[in-house]
Every structure is written in C-alpha cells, then in structure tokens.
C-alpha cells in the first residue's frame, strides 16, 4: 500500500486577487492632509472660496475616513496631538480659524463654512460634533485668543442648531473647571449664542439635553453657588443667563421641597411638624406664600393613590382634603394665596377628568374649613377664574355663589338693623 499522499495538481500562471471588500486600507492621513492644506493655502482668507473648495474636494477626497483630520486643519491649521498642540509634521496652513480675526463677524463667516460643508456632506455631522467635544477638552493647550474664537464659533453653531448643547459636557472636565478655563470660555460662548438667538432659545436647547440644571458645574465645588454664578456672569454682561440659572435653581428647590413634603405625608408625620418644616423652607428659600400654597396643594394631591371611578373619587378627595385642610389653611393667610389655591384646584380638576364633578364639593369643604373666604370665591366666580373648564365649574358653583350672596345681603341688613 502506498502511504505517500497523492500530490494535488496545481494551476500555474494564475494570480488570485483579494476581493475589494477584504482589502484593509491603511489609515494614512498625510496625503489627505497635504491636499487640504494646499487647497486652503490657495484660497487664503477668502471664505467663500474655502467653502467652494471644500464642497468640490468631497468628491475626490475621503472625508468620511479623515473627518477628524479635516476639522483639525480647518480649526488649528494642522493635525492636533493629544492635549491640543499641533503635530510635529510641517504640513500645516496659516489659513484657519485660530489665525483669523478675533471678532464676531469673522466667526459668523467661519460658522457658515462649517454649515455649508455639513449640509453638503451630511455624514460629517456626527464627526463634527465629536471634534467640538474634543476641542473643548483641549482648551488648556490653546492660547486665550484661540479659546475666544472657538467659544464664539461654538456659540454661533449652537444657535444655528449645527451641534447639540450636549457638547457642553466637555466643559465640566475637572481640570478645566479648577483652573477657571470653563467659566471664562462659557462667557464668550453664551454671549455669541444669545447674540444670535435669545435666552429663551438658549434655555430650550439646554433643557432638551438636560444641561439646564448643570451650569453651576462650570465652577469648582467650593464656588458652586447661585450667588457666585450670578455675580460672575452678571459682571461679565450676561445677566439674562444669571437670571435663568437662578430660576432653574428655584425650580429645582421647589421640586425637592414637593418631593420631601410627599414623603413626610406618606410617613404619616403630624401636620404640626409638616407646617413647621414648610415655614422653615419658606424662610430659607424666600419662597412667597402664593408659590408655597401651590407646592403644598400639589404635594397633598400627589400623596395618595386616587380611585379611577368618578363616583368614588369625590368621596375619597373630600376625606383626604378634610384631613389636610389645616395644612392648606396655614399657607392661605392672604387673599392672593387663597385665589392661587382656588385656581390650582380649578386646573387640577380640569386636568384630571375624574375630578371634574368634584370641584364644587372641594371648594365648599375648604370654605367650611376656613381655608377659602367668601370674598375670594366670589372674586373667582366673577372675574378671577381661568379658561380651563370655565363653563362646567361656573355652572357647578352657581347655587353656592347665590347662597353666599344672599347670606352676605342678610348679614348686611342685620348690621343695618342693629345700627
């Protein structure tokens, strides 16, 4: 038996090509860099020509693969090494964002270059946002002038919706915050952003990505107070941003207060202790009685699981509110607070459809408990109500209001007879 393996025939003169999809192209940005730098050197400071060059080059150069290189060159003139310094290679251009004039008009023109480029090549959007995040982390490696230009550009890009406000997360980097770089950068950024839009637009963008309550993080922990934030940005000419942050902190404090109140009620703490706690919080946070009664009402109504059946929920509400009427009474010492409470009740009964028929019974209960006065109820009925469910609630209150008016007239006539 021949144990030797039989040799298989071979094909000669045949070359097998690797399929294109199996080829692994080497990452080498140097040729790409040379092409971009050469083009920018030719276009110079003419940003219209720069935009046209970038538009045309996208058809010949691999923007998708070398997006970071492209953006590094447009911003800093060459490829950036970690930390924000330019790489040692000599392929760089003097025509970039960092060498441009430090004024808003020039930065607006640069923003247009980026805007046109990203609109033309939509796939660059994500890479551009990542580039901005990276540049913000490199701020310490840039000069003050370079930071100012980048801040102005970023503000304009945020205003135009080219990038998301989530990029601000990079500014909360501990080292940048500790050295005051983040706060100084934020001043320039928000000035250019508000210059393009307004504080309401800025606020909406911040809320969208959950940044509205994080602005205090631009400062180190020992300076992270509303007072410090307010003074810093007001002195820098950004009072509207200071007011916004103060308002956000106030909203945050109210939410925390409401949460704590609900927990105290769930734990079954005494009304005396709850009232003392609320009064202490009013002193600490300077919350007015009108604002506080709204918080108390919401907490009272959120501290219980309501029956889904309309016919049972009214009875449940009356029982619950009877228990907490002393708490409501403690924070309705003024007519304006009473009216605020009455409007809150109207809105609540309208927004929660099972309570639509309970409105009148709730008002009567609180009248009997000396929480709501007849003057305030009559004022609400004639002119003080809001539009929500107006016709339904006015109809419900009609007989009780007539009774109040008659009682008032009888009382007046008795006084006259007594005189």
From Swiss-Prot:
Keyword Transcription regulation: yes
CDD domains: W2_eIF5C_like (cd11560)
All copies of domain W2, residue ranges: 247-414
A Gene Ontology BP annotation from the UniProt entry: regulation of translational initiation
UniProt biased composition (Polar residues): 1-15
Alphabetical list of PANTHER family matching this protein: BASIC LEUCINE ZIPPER AND W2 DOMAIN-CONTAINING PROTEIN (PTHR14208), EIF5-MIMIC PROTEIN 2 (PTHR14208:SF0)
Protein's job: Translation initiation regulator which may repress repeat-associated non-AUG (RAN) initiated translation probably by acting as a competitive inhibitor of eukaryotic translation initiation factor 5 (EIF5) function. Enhances histone H4 gene transcription but does not seem to bind DNA directly.
Protein name: eIF5-mimic protein 2-A
Species of provenance: Danio rerio
Record lineage: Eukaryota, Metazoa, Chordata, Craniata, Vertebrata
Gene: bzw1a
């Amino acid at each position: 038996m021949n144990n030797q393996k039989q040799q298989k025939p071979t094909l000669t003169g045949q070359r097998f090509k690797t399929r294109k999809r199996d080829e692994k192209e080497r990452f080498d940005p140097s040729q790409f860099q040379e092409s971009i730098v050469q083009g920018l050197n030719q276009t110079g400071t003419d940003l219209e020509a720069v935009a046209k060059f970038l538009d045309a080059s996208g058809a010949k150069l691999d923007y998708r693969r070398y997006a970071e290189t492209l953006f590094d060159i447009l911003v800093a003139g060459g490829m950036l090494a970690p930390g924000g310094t330019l790489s040692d290679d000599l392929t760089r251009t003097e025509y970039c964002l960092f060498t441009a004039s430090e004024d808003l008009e020039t930065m607006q023109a640069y923003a247009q270059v980026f805007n046109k480029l990203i609109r033309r090549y939509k796939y660059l959007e994500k890479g551009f946002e990542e580039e901005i995040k990276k540049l913000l982390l490199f701020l310490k490696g840039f000069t003050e002038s370079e930071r100012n230009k980048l801040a102005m550009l970023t503000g304009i890009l945020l205003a135009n919706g080219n990038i998301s406000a989530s990029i601000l997360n990079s500014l909360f980097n501990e080292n940048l915050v500790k050295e005051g770089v983040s706060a100084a950068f934020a001043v320039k950024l928000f000035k250019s952003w508000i210059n393009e839009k307004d504080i309401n637009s800025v606020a909406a963008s911040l809320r969208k990505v959950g940044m509205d309550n994080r602005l205090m993080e631009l400062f180190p922990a020992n300076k992270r107070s509303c007072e410090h934030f307010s003074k810093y940005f007001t002195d820098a000419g950004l009072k509207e941003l200071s007011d916004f942050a103060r308002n956000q902190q106030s909203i945050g404090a109210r939410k925390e207060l409401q949460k704590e109140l609900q927990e105290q009620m769930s734990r079954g703490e005494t009304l005396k202790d709850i009232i003392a706690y609320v009064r202490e919080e009013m002193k600490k946070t300077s919350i007015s009685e009108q604002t506080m009664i709204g918080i108390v009402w919401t907490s009272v109504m959120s501290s219980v699981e309501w029956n889904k059946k309309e016919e049972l929920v009214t009875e449940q509400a009356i029982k619950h509110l009877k228990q907490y009427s002393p708490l409501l009474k403690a924070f309705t010492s003024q007519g304006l607070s009473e009216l605020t409470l009455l409007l809150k009740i109207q809105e609540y009964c309208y927004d929660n459809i099972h309570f639509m028929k309970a409105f009148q019974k709730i008002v009567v209960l609180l009248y009997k408990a000396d929480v709501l006065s007849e003057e305030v109820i009559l004022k609400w009925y004639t002119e003080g109500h809001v539009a929500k469910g107006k016709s339904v609630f006015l109809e419900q209150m009609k007989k009780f209001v007539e009774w109040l008016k008659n009682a008032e007239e009888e009382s007046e006539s008795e006084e006259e007879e007594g005189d």
